[in-house]
Amino acid sequence: MALKHFLNTQDWSCSELNALLTQARAFKHNKLGNGLKGKSIALVFFNASMRTRSSFELGAFQLGGHAIVLQPGKDAWPIEFDTGTVMEAETEEHICEVARVLGHYVDLIGVRAFPKFLDWTYDRQDIVLNGFAKYSPVPVINMETITHPCQELAHIMALQEHFGTTDLRGKKYVLTWTYHPKPLNTAVANSALTIATRLGMDVTLLCPTPDYVLDERYIDWAQQNIADTGSTFQVSHDIDNAYRGADVIYAKSWGALPFFGNWAMEKPIRDQYRHFIVDEAKMALTNNAVFSHCLPLRRNVKATDAVMDGPNCIAIHEAGNRLHVQKAIMAALASQ
């Protein structure tokens, strides 16, 4: 039987994802368990984290396990991922050794590694995550690279709790780009598009121009998913039409893929679209929609105080669910 990793949700069947969500709900009501008793996880962070690190460390503890945190280039040696490289630069060891050695010590490995933002054709290969998955003898969990599947499940769990049902088919789901002064990762947007179409929601991707449409891989996944579920997917640049009648507004900012490595040219374009902020006027067009965001969020840049503090905002609940879904993921993978 092939080793099962948690790299993205598209690799897992709907029944497997539903089982994870069912287990996550159980953990939410009874936080302690023994799914990691006597086991350990290495959490490898190439980028900063608050919610991900704290929820994974605490989750491992609550399951009776132990987590160690490694930050290559800070408290651990810099790692090389390219093959055939003459390692005369700053990297001290290669992933083919790192992953295999860690696999002798721990039972799971979590990886968080953002794009370099210089060349999307390179970044989309996700070489850090895939390098760990290729060489690791133990299951690997994606803690956010170019997708964020843990956030996906926490988001869906929060939506199911809000609507009081696990069946989200037919909900109008709007994934909206929002302004941010810096170009950000597309990971959460890629994941939101994937899971929303997978679960049969009618999805609108709202963004300022075609340059902000997500990578074709995730557009293709969305098209495959709606073919399976009978739901719909469209890209829109019209704010009012996108918001009108929506049941879910999910906000995220991301950099335009054609400008990777040339952000000075992208910034004046992005600066024209500050009006994509989620505010009360836009929310008034919806079907009393629920609003969420993965956090962190710059208030009154991405969404107004009134939206964030309003009764329909579930961003805090979504973030809280990270603990429960990650415990479910760790327990499932550790039981292989």
UniProtKB/Swiss-Prot annotation:
Any GO BP annotation: L-arginine biosynthetic process
UniProt KW keywords: Amino-acid biosynthesis, Arginine biosynthesis, Cytoplasm, Transferase
The protein's annotated pathway: Amino-acid biosynthesis; L-arginine biosynthesis
Key residue in conferring substrate specificity for N-acetyl-L-ornithine versus N-succinyl-L-ornithine, annotated site positions: E92
Pfam families reported for this sequence: OTCace (PF00185), OTCace_N (PF02729)
Reaction it catalyzes: N(2)-acetyl-L-ornithine + carbamoyl phosphate = N(2)-acetyl-L-citrulline + phosphate + H(+)
Residues bound to carbamoyl phosphate: S49, M50, R51, T52, W77, R112, H148, P149, C150, Q151, C294, L295, R322
Activity regulation description: Carboxylation at Lys-302 increases the catalytic activity of the enzyme.
Residues the record lists as binding N(2)-acetyl-L-ornithine: E144, K252, L295
GO CC entries: cytoplasm
Localization, UniProt: Cytoplasm
EC number: 2.1.3.9
Enzyme superclass (EC): transferase
One example GO MF annotation: ornithine carbamoyltransferase activity
Modification N6-carboxylysine occurs at: K302
Record InterPro entries: ArgF, Asp/Orn_carbamoyltranf_P-bd, Asp/Orn_carbamoylTrfase, Asp/Orn_carbamoylTrfase_sf, Asp_carbamoyltransf_Asp/Orn-bd
Superkingdom assignment: Bacteria
Annotated HAMAP family: AOTCase
Family membership noted in the UniProt record: Belongs to the aspartate/ornithine carbamoyltransferase superfamily. AOTCase family.
Role according to the record: Catalyzes the transfer of the carbamoyl group from carbamoyl phosphate to the delta-amino group of N(2)-acetyl-L-ornithine to produce N(2)-acetyl-L-citrulline. This is a step in an alternative arginine biosynthesis pathway. The enzyme has no activity with ornithine.
Subunit details: Homotrimer.
Protein name: N-acetylornithine carbamoyltransferase
